[in-house]
Amino acid sequence: MPKTDQHYMSLAVQAAQNGQGHVEPNPMVGCVIVADDQVIGIGWHENYGGPHAELNAMTSVKAELKDKIAGATAYVSLEPCSHQGKTGPCCDALIAAKIARVVIAVVDPNPKVSGQGIAKMQVAGIEVVTDVLTDKAEQVVAPYLKRTRTGLPWVIAKWAMTIDGSIASASGDSQWISNEKSRKRVHDLRRRVDAVMVGIGTALADDPMLNPRPAGKRIVTRVVVDSAVRLPLDSKLVKTSNEFPTLIAVDGEQAKTQADKIAALEASGCQVWQSNPGRDSNQRLLELLKHLASNGVTNLMVEGGGQILGALNDLSQIDEVHLFTGAKLLGGENARSPVAGTGPSLMNAATQMQLQQVERIDNDVYSVYRRVNEA
């Protein structure tokens, strides 16, 4: 019995995920080449600036099967590009290879592509089918879709908490809530994102490095939201800013009286970004998110503290949550909550999340949630 378009597209979507942490700010894309109801090639976008999924899939076809590419069907999880970037247009490669049919899961919202690849292939005589397994494919490219459509990054909130929901004691002590294996998992997550961000409270309390250890191939930018320019010059973040990209986001109004401190931060290697004067804290945060996205940040992991996570929640900008629950019962009415901010007054206005993954890490529980699309 012949396999369906949905079956082959599921293979393409699965292949796309092999690029996670390597291709951003490009989207993860997979491609499967099928001839005579048999998969003859499979590929994915492997690294930023490298060949795209379609070319990798055709290259993977064994020599004795190369003649089957002409007349084959290509299943692509995202519309093939039609413009010259770091690589040539993928639709041109499919046309040149004499692919007969192209099945697409998601039409690319990028104005440089958006239907143009489809039109170009149709003019060349290729049959094009769209909207196959779209929901599943959109989950994989959700960060790219958000940045392309809204100019904002995909925000991943990460925190560790006790079983009664505290991220620190009333005194601010938080080391350690989760176990060593969970903390190693955090470094794996850092290697997958474009930037890691904390608020100044966390930076002052923990004096963190925020870089993935061991380092991955990608360079992760460290971001500190520091409205009043309080980050010490002898902090680990500042002292290592020549080694790891470090952006300090300050309030443009406060910056007027902190010229010497800002100059010292910049001399140490930090990049200092100033918001437009006169903005409130949430407006400044949204402005910062737009700045990061416009500079190639697709995936932004925010590691606290409660104030910045609360502000992001109030702005409806938390897209994904990675939660490590340590097997500790803390108590105390003044213990610190992971998400502060204003929050809604009614439970039915709370941000609805969908559980994606649950994993036991020794005596910790690791959970992943994604925001439910309210559209």
Regions inferred by a protein language model and the residue ranges of each:
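Proteins enriched for Cys/Gly/acidic motifs involved in redox and nucleic-acid/cofactor modification
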Residues: H22-V23, G49-G50, I118, V132-A160
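Enzymes that bind and transform nitrogen-containing heteroaromatic metabolites
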Residues: P2-P27, I42, V61, K86, ...
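Helix-turn-helix
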Residues: G30
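Short alpha-helix boundary/capping motifs
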Residues: L65, Q122-V123, T148-T150, E320, ...
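Zn2+-dependent cytidine deaminase-like catalytic core
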Residues: I33, Q38-K136, T221, G252-Q254, ...
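Short capping loops/turns at secondary-structure boundaries
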Residues: N110-S114, T130-L133, T148-L152, Q175-N179
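Sequence-level detector for tyrosine residue identity
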Residues: Y8, Y48, Y75, Y144, ...
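A short, flexible N-terminal coil/short beta segment enriched in small residues
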Residues: D36-G43, K136-R149, V238-S241
